[in-house]
Amino acid sequence: MVNLTHMRIACSTVKSQLNLLSITATLIAATLSATALGAEVTATILSPRALQEIAQVETEIDRIEAQAIERLAALPGNQIQQIELLGKLMLYDKQLSVNRNEACAFCHTPETGFTGPVSELNRTTASYPGSVRTRFSNRKPQSHAYAPLSPVLHYNPGQHDLVGGNFWDMRATGRRLGNPAAEQAEGPPTNPVEMGLPDIACAVYRASQRPYRALFENIWGQQAFALAWPRDVELVCARPGPPPAGAPMPVQLSPLDRGRASVTFDQMAQSIAGYEASAEVTQFTSKYDAVLSGKSQFTTQEKAGYELFRGKAQCNACHRDGGPGEDPLFTDFTASNIGTPANPRLPYYAEKQPDSLGYVANPAGSSFVDRGVGDFLTEAHLLSQPSPVDQRWVKLAPDNQARIQVPTLRNVDKRPYPSFVKAYMHNGYFTSLKSIVHFYNTRDVLPRCQPHDVGEGTTCWPAPESSENMNKSRVGRLGLSDAEEDAIVSFVQTLTDGFMPAN
């Protein structure tokens, strides 16, 4: 058996790999007015360009999975490395989704810093389809690199902030398993808009059929998959979630086997999180790291940007570059509302009607507002969470409405080629680093955009999705010149892993 106390374990906001053949007929995305969420929502098939990119990503995921499977023939002797391999195998395994068509890795590939790998989706829908192709999340994929280093969610009374957890809304607290990243890994498999399984037991059953079963049992014990599966398990696990209201655990297991399935599911998540914490993912190999170690130097523009980052622009207040005894993670793991506009490109706004399976992802339709951490802290939500929470946090909900976890800036510019589009912020509203810095600089300087204003992002900004608890002290009126904005972007680009210092 394994003790993970001293491991840095992590997992991503995982979603999924797509099956191109089924997408061409069924995958829809919302197209909305660029300035009015109240406008009529229509549906459209994904573009040929998006489908082509998806096929390329699928091919790469299959290649990586095949290489990982080959490593089963010559296992590393180190048990931590075995756990990392097991986690990688599950992360790239599309069989762990309801329609056997999505791997967690579909939204988290190395070439993009372990976030969304489809440029056309980042440019258009921002969020990614689930195993049920017509279902999209309300948020863009987070990077799972460096997520292992987030602490268990706790309240810091000195700064009046919640700190830690995983997910944009911090709901993977880490209070049950001792690690937020492992608990985060347990979310997507049974999320109806992600991997879509109706029961955690389905994930365990599917894993028991995979080539890595022997490795799993070697690490976690022979009892891991020693369950008496019902005859209809294949049929039950092929029905997309959510499960019927009267049968929240549709796989019929004995109490003993249900407990065993829960333990094994935890171990699956811990293994995935172990891979996310490995040096393959959480690397610290950027130019910034090389400068810290004396192996490289900033350019004049990068150095100026770093000074602005730590000074006039106040970026370092939340995206901390570390202090005594701290790793430079470029996040403080708190939450903030910077006033990001709603992203009308999200297909989630169109998911108000029952789909072909009767599921309604977004009853609020175009009136949906993402209230982030505040929604997580409501009493009803807290009581529904599998991870223990402090009920005293309910009173913190008003002060956390619309606040979103501060992401790391590491790898924000990592991309497979220069023209590749990345989506930024929790809803993917921004698609360039320059636009983000300009927003921080001018949010409260430029006027509000009028409907169909062609100057959006240049001469005006849309209203925030929610103005509750909006950060007004460090965002909105920074007084930066255009050249200073460019310098900050130049510095942030030094945070991309994979830098090779000149000899």
Q: Model features per residue range: what roles?
A:
Residues 37-503:
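Periplasmic c-type cytochrome electron-transfer domains
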Residues 22-33:
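Bacterial N-terminal signal peptides
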Residues 4-24:
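Bacterial N-terminal signal peptides that target proteins for export
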